[in-house]
């Protein structure tokens, strides 16, 4: 089955408990997108944004439309999302090298619930693609898949 897509402004977003977003650069949320996405997230939805490279400046700017009074906060390595199914004692694993920077996980919380996860300098999605696409070793792909399982489990349980 093909992955489903949904627009941030669509009411269909409320049928998905978890939404995954990825890309390489320019992201823009209209006011309608931002309002609907905020409503989705504070109503129980979860958004994982995986920076495939180049999204961070756009995401930081556009998330200000969604949550004008909140900043992305770096998650500590002992955050439960790193141990919900598989243990990552160092936090977010590094999957794909772009420029040698350390992987970072950022979040936005609402009423003590992590509602948005932004993974940066990790590129989990590369490890989720077919092995032939990036020629990643099996252990790298397994780390990506296990971290993905952690994200899904955490999102469904919190």
Predicted regions and their residues:
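Surface-exposed patches in mature extracellular/periplasmic domains of secreted proteins
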Residues: 1-7, 49-52, 70-78
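Alpha-helical scaffolding within the catalytic cores
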Residues: 2-8, 30-35, 100-104
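Extracellular/periplasmic catalytic domains that process cell-envelope and extracellular macromolecules
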Residues: 11-15, 41-42, 107-112
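An acidic, glycine-rich "communication" segment
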Residues: 56-130, 140-149
């Amino acid at each position: 089955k093909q992955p489903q897509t949904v627009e941030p402004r669509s009411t269909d977003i409320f049928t998905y408990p978890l939404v995954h977003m990825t890309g390489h650069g320019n992201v823009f949320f209209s006011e309608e997108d931002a309002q609907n996405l905020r409503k989705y997230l504070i109503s129980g939805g979860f958004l994982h944004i995986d920076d495939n490279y180049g999204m961070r400046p756009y995401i930081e700017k556009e998330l200000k439309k969604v949550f004008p009074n909140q900043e992305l906060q770096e998650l500590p390595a002992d955050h439960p999302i790193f141990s919900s199914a598989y243990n990552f004692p160092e936090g977010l694993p590094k999957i794909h090298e772009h420029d040698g920077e350390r992987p970072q996980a950022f979040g936005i919380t609402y009423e003590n619930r992590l509602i948005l996860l932004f993974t940066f300098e990790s590129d989990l999605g590369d490890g989720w693609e077919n092995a032939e696409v990036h020629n990643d070793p099996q252990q790298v792909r397994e780390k990506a898949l296990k971290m993905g399982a952690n994200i899904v489990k955490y999102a469904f349980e919190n």
